[in-house]
Regions:
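Non-catalytic terminal accessory/regulatory regions of metabolic enzymes
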Residues: 1-82
Length: 82
């Protein structure tokens, strides 16, 4: 059984209000030294059999179609990542 991890992040030019809220809260909680926070989504997909190039292409297509908004988000799919 193979596994693919899909990470969905806002494109760099898109403002991230949730990330900004976390960044603003960090010093209030005693965590200093952070200059930026970006929030995203992570999906772990288990596939039957080995992860081939065809399977990875299908995962990327599904991620672009279903798991993300390609207008404002970027998708990265990695085979077998922890």
């Amino acid at each position: 059984m193979g596994r693919v991890v899909v990470e969905v992040m806002l494109k760099p030019e898109i403002l991230d209000p949730q990330g900004q809220a976390v960044l603003n809260a960090l010093p209030r909680l005693g965590f200093d030294g952070f200059s930026s926070v970006r929030q995203g989504k992570r999906f772990e997909l288990s596939v039957d059999g080995e992860v081939t190039d065809e399977v990875l292409a299908q995962v990327r297509e599904a991620a672009t179609t279903l798991l993300s908004n390609p207008v404002i988000e970027d998708v990265v799919a990695v085979v077998g990542a922890p």
